Design a protein with these regions (language model features):
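C-terminal lobe helix-coil module of Hanks-type protein kinase domains
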Residues: 1-45
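Extracytoplasmic/lumenal domain signature
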Residues: 66-69, 77-111, 115-191, 195-416
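Short, surface-exposed, charge-dense and proline/glycine-enriched linear segments
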Residues: 18, 57-58, 255, 414
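Juxtacatalytic C-terminal regulatory tail of Ser/Thr protein kinases
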Residues: 27-77
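Short amphipathic alpha-helical "recognition" segments used for binding
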Residues: 15, 20, 36-37, 44-47, ...
Length: 416
């Protein structure tokens, strides 16, 4: 039943906090509190889209008793309508005058990392589909529908694509046509991106197990049980025959290729971040606000660096530094040997996107709706591109093109 005592101003605030697109909600609890206090005092309430339009948003003031406009009504950005799952009209950002090479619009949010291989770019979407698009112009090639959305990103090996789904399955498809080869059922959603090595696929599931699966036929080789869901993508060292990954209970594991634990490390909170490896170090982030560097052979902590909020972003590494985002809105450059902060770059909101390094630049997205390109040496901004939603997707940069998705339902191809 409708509660007549709820004012239009309160209704507008509640609607904004519950809107489907995270980028259109309040930027923080503090921002929502400020508006609620103003409403209580009978002041004008400013409800502003959390991600202003490319050509500039405006603030809508709602006085007590007034009716709020629909969320996003102040946006002046127009995206050409296109048939579902086809390329849209090109958008030009007023920030640095950037025009995408092409844009492909899907039916739901894109939170995964696009995978350009050969003539295709593959992207998994919450509309339950894995898409294959032309890298040249973004034209639709094929799509494969699962029974659940895709939070995991696709991987490609031997001409085939492998991807986990919310329906609990890992799918193997032909890369050329999307024809299904086999599927492997786990006990819960698969939000972990798989890793292919030594003829096997290593993938975590919300059923708390790491699964080792044969590439040929999808038969189980072994499983390893952990205390919590696994969403951290495994890192595999072929020569040492080691598999590294974290779980949501805050534990980080090193297994051999037979599924036997060699060592484990405990952090204080969940490890969603996927590890990277460089010079004998395994580096990853944790929800306990820290970035860790562990000795790969023993699990001994070489260093840890605290950020301002949880770290779900995964690190990119160079010869001298590790680069990783934090929910405090900063991208950090950390010295590989000491963990010392070399520099940090501040964005307008949380960073869940994992950075990519390409030609002395770093590319990543932020919940503030921007795709950023910054200098690797000092963190200076080169350019930024505005989307109409939070950018949780991680970029892939190949042949001078940045492929990245947004919660605005679009996949963007940008010139690097």
């Amino acid at each position: 039943k409708i509660n007549p005592s709820v004012s239009p101003g309160m209704e507008a605030i509640i609607n904004k906090s519950l809107v489907y697109n995270p980028g259109e909600r309040f930027l923080s609890a503090a921002a929502m509190k400020e508006v609620l206090i103003a409403l209580q005092r009978g002041q004008a309430v400013a409800v502003q889209p959390a991600t202003p339009a490319i050509s500039g948003g405006s603030v809508t003031s709602i006085l007590p008793g007034q009716i709020a406009p629909p969320v996003g009504a102040t946006s002046t950005l127009s995206i050409q309508s296109a048939p579902t799952g086809q390329e849209t009209g090109l958008l030009t950002s007023t920030y640095f005058g950037i025009t995408p090479l092409w844009v492909f619009r899907c039916e739901d949010e894109i939170r995964s990392q696009p995978l350009p291989v050969g003539k295709f770019v593959y992207v998994s979407v919450y509309d339950n589909n894995l898409y294959a698009l032309s890298r040249a112009d973004g034209k639709f090639a094929w799509k494969y529908a699962s029974e659940g959305g895709f939070a995991a990103s696709p991987v490609h090996e031997g001409g085939n694509v492998y991807i986990g789904s919310e329906d609990g399955k890992l799918y193997a498809l032909t890369g050329e046509t999307g024809r299904p080869l086999w599927s492997y059922q786990t006990g819960e959603s698969v939000r972990c991106t798989a890793r292919v090595a030594q003829g096997h696929i290593f993938v975590g599931s919300d059923d708390r197990f790491l699964h080792a699966i044969s590439m040929h036929g999808g038969k189980r080789a072994w499983t390893y049980e952990t205390p919590a869901p696994i969403r951290s993508r495994p890192y595999v060292l072929d020569k040492e025959a080691r598999v590294f990954f974290g779980c949501e209970a805050g534990e980080f594991f090193c297994l051999d290729f037979g599924g036997n634990m060699k060592w484990r490390h405990r952090s204080k909170r969940a490890i969603t971040s996927s590890p990277n490896f460089v010079d004998g170090l395994v580096i990853f982030g944790s929800a306990d606000y820290n970035v860790y560097a562990l000795e790969a052979s023993s699990g001994w902590t070489v260093w840890k660096q605290r950020t301002g909020k949880p770290v779900v972003s995964s690190p990119a590494v160079s010869e001298k530094a590790a680069y990783i985002g934090s929910a405090d809105g900063n991208l950090y450059a950390l010295d590989l040997r000491s963990g010392k902060i070399l520099w940090k770059f501040e964005t307008g909101d949380q960073i869940a996107s994992s950075p990519a390094i390409y030609k002395n630049a770093i590319y990543f997205g932020s919940v503030d709706g921007f795709v950023y390109c910054i200098e690797m040496k000092d963190g200076k901004l080169r350019w930024k591109f505005k989307t109409e939603g939070a950018v949780i997707s991680s970029p892939t940069v190949v042949d001078d093109v940045v492929y990245i998705g947004s919660t605005d339902h679009n996949l963007y191809a940008l010139t690097a």
